[in-house]
Regions:
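Metal/cofactor-centered catalytic core regions of large enzymes
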Residues: 1-414
Length: 414
């Protein structure tokens, strides 16, 4: 199917002068339509006021804040360790990334070096979470557009990794497995065996997803040429992740500001050409292959060693020592109840989550609690481009365009 920008009716565009727009000779009365608020079961409550001319979108105004819980303010009232479970409730579809990004920010503030084995464990779990996130997006986006079969296939394979998370940390969604200075627990032989088995099982399943969608004329027709954004506009709006790389911008924090075990792994960063919904789908599928490649390399390179930095004034003691040693029990109690004494200063640390750049900005005036914590959530940033990317498309494209960002309102509203 040839590439074609589907914005053609509301404003007539002169091909010779694409920057100029003229009104059509026949204009209908504009209509305001409320899309949402939706039920919380749809991963967040969102209202978008759509301004229509016929069936074409003239303007889209997102109304945010229905899921605002004051998460950033809560950070000021608890210790640094106590805030980790709160991060689970941001993007609750992929909580591991929230834990990871927050812990990296605190470690940067405290100048803590994480042990090598812990870095490999973190990277493996982060890439497993990326696979889960992209499977969730692919299944629900396909379902919204009309390809129901892919939804069942994606969630079938996602369940394998959700059960793996359950065995790893006792939770499927709100995980709280990452710790400041390391991780909560190591992999067991059972977890390693199941993960290796999944790495052999999964790549052929990705091929199945592609066959189902790329040979589906409805899917191709509803994604190619829809929600186009240029590289310049994508950068101007502050987009990141697959949404930015779909426009051909080569920017991935795992490469640009590399961290954890990523410098020791070889992987590619897929880039789109047209900046449309189809390119963003293609990038996410390619990232599934790359995540498998990264996990394999980490498993091959990982050596035995500690999983927590040895900084008694900041990091938690091993749980077995807490049960058998009085000093370790007191250390854990004090770290959770009083916190550690952070230096004065401010830092920002960004992490490449599956949606885009997830960053934490922390201002410390000393003491055991942050003075201010600000979260840079990719979902919130991407919602700012919704009006720009939806103008001129059909009302039936609104759900497709909203889904192309992979937005979770818990992260957006906070």
């Amino acid at each position: 199917m040839a590439f074609e920008d589907q914005r053609t009716t509301v404003y007539k565009i002169d091909p010779a002068h694409p920057g100029s727009e003229t009104l059509p000779t026949l204009r209908t009365e504009e209509l305001l339509l409320n899309m949402g608020p939706q039920h919380p079961a749809t991963h967040g409550v969102l209202k978008v006021i759509l301004e229509l001319e016929g069936e074409r979108l003239v303007k889209s105004t997102p109304v945010l804040g229905y899921l605002h819980r004051g998460v950033e303010k809560l950070a000021e009232d608890g210790t640094y360790h106590q805030f980790i479970p709160h991060t689970d409730r941001l993007d609750y579809v992929c909580a591991m990334y929230n834990n990871f990004a927050y812990c990296r920010a605190v470690e940067k503030l405290m100048n803590i070096t994480v042990p090598d084995r812990a870095e490999y464990l973190r990277t493996i779990v982060a890439e497993v979470q990326r696979i889960i996130g992209h499977q969730f997006w692919l299944g629900t986006q396909a379902l919204d557009i009309g390809a129901m079969t892919v939804f069942f296939y994606c969630f079938r394979d996602r369940e394998i990794l959700m059960d793996w998370f359950d065995e790893l940390c006792g939770a499927r969604l709100t995980t709280s497995w990452y710790r400041i200075g390391g991780v909560e627990r190591d992999f067991t032989s059972s977890l390693l065996g199941k993960l290796k088995q999944f790495l052999d099982y999964f790549p052929p399943k990705i091929d199945e997803y592609k066959v189902f969608l790329e040979t589906n004329r409805i899917w191709v027709g509803r994604t190619k040429g829809v929600a186009i954004i240029s590289a310049e506009d994508a950068v101007s709006f502050g987009l990141s992740g697959p949404t930015l790389r779909g426009s051909g911008v080569d920017y991935d924090l795992r490469k640009a500001q590399t961290y954890s075990a990523y410098p020791k792994c070889e992987f590619s960063v897929p880039l789109g050409k047209n900046g449309d919904t189809y390119d963003r789908y293609w990038i996410r599928v390619q990232e599934l292959y790359e995540s498998v490649k990264i996990i394999r390399q980490c498993l091959e390179q990982m050596q035995d060693g500690p999983i927590m930095a040895d900084v008694p004034s900041v990091t938690l003691p091993p749980k077995q020592r807490v049960f058998t040693n009085l000093e370790s029990m007191i250390q854990q109690f004090k770290l959770f109840s009083q916190g550690f004494d952070a230096p004065r200063g401010e830092i920002y640390c960004g992490t490449e989550a599956h949606k885009g750049e997830l960053g934490f900005y922390i201002v410390s005036t000393g003491g055991g609690k942050p003075y201010r914590l600000k979260i840079r959530a990719p979902s919130f940033i991407h919602m700012g481009a919704f009006d720009h990317m939806s103008r001129g498309y059909m009302i039936s494209d609104a759900v497709t365009i909203f889904g192309t960002y992979d937005i979770v309102m818990g992260e957006c509203d906070r």
